[in-house]
Amino acid sequence: AVHTPRKTVTARTVAQRSYLDLLRRHEVVFSVGPAGTGKTYLAVAVGLSMLRQGRVKRIVLTRPAVEAGERLGFLPGDMAEKINPYLRPLYDALYDMLPQPKVAAMLEAGSIEIAPLAFMRGRTLNEAFMILDEAQNTTREQMKMFLTRMGLGSRMVVAGDMTQVDLPMPSGDARSRSGLVHAMHILKNVPGLAIHHFTKADVVRHPLVGAIVTAYDHANTDSEKS
């Protein structure tokens, strides 16, 4: 279990329990699986716990800001208005564990930072708990850029779903460009790095979500056969 100000976050499946253990023991953890398995949510809980214990000085939450064929340039409004729709799920996880005024105060103080992945370029983040969400939508270059931001005393979680690659592709398979797919292939034997896989059996949203994931998996399998 992980204690946060608003609630105690507990593992609901064996795989989630194993994941929490990896998050506590490893400095870099890749977490892969379908939506609703707690990949990012549990990482945020562990990050908040480590922040409260003084094991890190800040939490940095990020995700690529290109999803489902949309680019920031085509969204209305100023930069804050443009990026907030992409970052909303990260705020939702925080608000579930912390009172909203506390989140606002921590954002103001810099102990929590939420930003698009592009804002990470050129930085070195020391004593930070870094979470990259929707990592399947990074390019190889973006993934390398993120992984090399890690400074002394930092920890890193890379979470994604390899069946939901939304990278725009001129031609060919979007999966082949995904930084997550590539990184997991070339980094699988790096000491100190852990890779954790969730399945649809670990979905902890509404019971129908698991059935929906299964139906789409079957549809994709059928289309590949035909």
Name each region found by the language model:
Residues 1-3:
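Charged, amphipathic alpha-helical linker segments immediately N-terminal to NTP-binding catalytic cores
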Residues 6-14, 18, 22-132, 136-226:
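Conserved helicase motor core of SF1/SF2 NTP-dependent helicases
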